[in-house]
Amino acid sequence: VTTVRYPGGNFVSAYHWEDGVGAKEKRPHKLDLAWRSIETNEFGTNEFMKWAKKTNVNPIFTVNLGTRGVEDAAHYLEYCNFSSGTQYSDMRKSHGVDEPYGIKMWCLGNEMDGSWQIGHKSAEEYGKIAAETGKVMKLIDPDIELIVCGSSLSSMDTYPEWDMEVLDKTYDVADYLALHQYYAGQEKGTKTFLAQSVDMEEYIHTIRSVAQVIKQKKRSKKDMKFSVDEWGVWAVPSNTVNNEIDEKPWQIAPAI
């Protein structure tokens, strides 16, 4: 593994990054409604970056566009990447991190097309807030690269119209479109499992075509890149999901 996204997945859409910095004994315990658990916030931004340095992985950071927005994203970027002399850069320094992290890649939300997502949005709603958020973030740090949310899965009812509308609204500020895809295991046999690679190829081909259409529409010289930042074999039975909250904190944080 060379790259890890933080805070990852559905968790981020209700996450307040300020809860995960500073003295651990003062960090609040919060309900994590995405995964129906208690989040202790004992592992936050600075702990993640210490881990990333030790393991030599490249970080991708994600901002909350589910319950928060432009201002919060700007503050988080300032905390991580601005040198000193401002409220949030000096907050980072007060937490024992003198030098800015210089986080290069940032995701603008996570799977905002999904009805399961806290703060779920239409393509139009998401496209607008992502474009404005990206614009402000690049005013703070012009060297960052931004990843906008594509369809959560190629099986979504709104695919690929979602991707087209989001790119239409964000093409000028976005550098990558996120692709997420999970496949079932071998319940239907090895041949069926392996054949799913054909579906993935078709998924990528379709999204490339969508991006080319928007590029031509915008008369842009920029080629949109793609970030496959969630993928794997889905092994969690659907009947395990319920509305009960586990009052015991996760032993492994769902933020990773």
Regions found by a protein language model. Give the residues of each.
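Aromatic-lined carbohydrate-binding surfaces of glycoside hydrolases
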Residues: 4-25, 46, 64-80, 153-155
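Aromatic- and acidic-residue-enriched carbohydrate-binding clefts of CAZyme catalytic domains
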Residues: 10-45, 50, 54, 86-116, ...
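Non-catalytic scaffold segments within catalytic domains of secreted glycoside hydrolases
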Residues: 28, 70-99, 115-225, 232-256
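Short, surface-exposed connector motifs at secondary-structure boundaries
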Residues: 31, 54-59, 143-144
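Second-shell loop/turn segments in exported
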Residues: 61-64, 120-121
